[in-house]
């Protein structure tokens, strides 16, 4: 996968381009030794990357959350879990490809995985509806969660959506009802639920698989009731004010952790999760295992009581 750079990363991109050019020259003519210059530029690039990512603002984090090369749910399933078996359909209307789910093993322990999937190529993005689920997607998710409860399996969800699909067909089939039902049912499921925002956490589309006992966010993910562009369009009548909106919305992992709306922030590799899938997956796996170990200590009554108190605490300082 070719590396793509965001606008604020352009100085880094220029250095990386110079490094690649020098490598190409060195490979074409073995008599030319450019190792020292390449090493110098690599060091400079690493320092610039460190400096850039130490001071990202909320709008830049929003761009990172949407990075086209960012790992999606299926990438984490491939890197973290074994024996994944896809389960499809809501048993009522269709199999929504914007939601993927199924049975897998985490360190030999059976779990149920559910997550949004955006797609990379144009064809796959259309197939996945750009990660925006319809009601049948959320009903599929609920079916899998209820199956997990029957077999006493922990539920692990990965959140990455700009929001639930707002199309006419989705509304006709009960989009708001499907989301609301998931919120209610997830609050009462008798098995541990671990939710992780891996990219965009957009409004009710994210919440519909986001009620749990542990709520985590990747370092450069976002979680909000609306996109910065949408907020800017409403408040300032212009999407051009998106960067201002992002700052006031408090959508970053660090801000939400300060507000105690999430439990932990999972560190990303320098430059973002897309720079190193293996490192990111290892960091996420460690968090999931630690959360499962923590929740395993609780009996069912305590688990549900803690989840209820978490939900009731939202909105209170």
Swiss-Prot record:
InterPro entries listed in its UniProt record: Acetyl_CoA_COase_a_su (IPR001095), ClpP/crotonase-like_dom_sf (IPR029045), COA_CT_C (IPR011763)
Pfam family, one: ACCA
The keyword Transcription regulation belongs to this UniProt entry's keyword annotation: no
Matching PROSITE patterns: COA_CT_CTER (PS50989)
Catalytic activity field: N(6)-carboxybiotinyl-L-lysyl-[protein] + acetyl-CoA = N(6)-biotinyl-L-lysyl-[protein] + malonyl-CoA
Keywords: ATP-binding, Cytoplasm, Fatty acid biosynthesis, Fatty acid metabolism, Lipid biosynthesis, Lipid metabolism, Nucleotide-binding, Transferase
GO biological process: fatty acid biosynthetic process; malonyl-CoA biosynthetic process
Pathway: Lipid metabolism; malonyl-CoA biosynthesis; malonyl-CoA from acetyl-CoA: step 1/1
GO CC annotations, alphabetized: acetyl-CoA carboxylase complex
EC number: 2.1.3.15
Catalytic EC class: transferase
Compartment annotation: Cytoplasm
Keyword Plastid among record annotations: no
GO molecular function, one term: carboxyl- or carbamoyltransferase activity
Domain CoA carboxyltransferase C-terminal: start-end pairs: 33-294
Family: Belongs to the AccA family.
Subunit architecture: Acetyl-CoA carboxylase is a heterohexamer composed of biotin carboxyl carrier protein (AccB), biotin carboxylase (AccC) and two subunits each of ACCase subunit alpha (AccA) and ACCase subunit beta (AccD).
UniProt function note: Component of the acetyl coenzyme A carboxylase (ACC) complex. First, biotin carboxylase catalyzes the carboxylation of biotin on its carrier protein (BCCP) and then the CO(2) group is transferred by the carboxyltransferase to acetyl-CoA to form malonyl-CoA.
Protein's name according to its UniProt entry: Acetyl-coenzyme A carboxylase carboxyl transferase subunit alpha
Record organism: Histophilus somni (strain 2336) (Haemophilus somnus)
